[in-house]
Amino acid sequence: MKVRSSVKKRCEKCRIIKRNGRIMVICENPRHKQKQG
C-alpha cells in the first residue's frame, strides 16, 4: 500500500474508490494499491 498525495490509475484494472472519506486505488495487481494521505 503506497500513501501518496495524488493517486492515479496505473493500469486498466485499477479502480478508484472512496473509503472512510479517503480516496484509494484497488487493483488485481497488489503493487498498484494506493491510498491518499
From Swiss-Prot:
One of its GO terms (biological process) is translation. Signal peptide: none annotated. InterPro entries: Ribosomal_bL36, Ribosomal_bL36_sp. GO terms for molecular function: structural constituent of ribosome. One of its GO terms (cellular component) is ribonucleoprotein complex. Pfam families: Ribosomal_L36. Belongs to the bacterial ribosomal protein bL36 family. This is Large ribosomal subunit protein bL36.
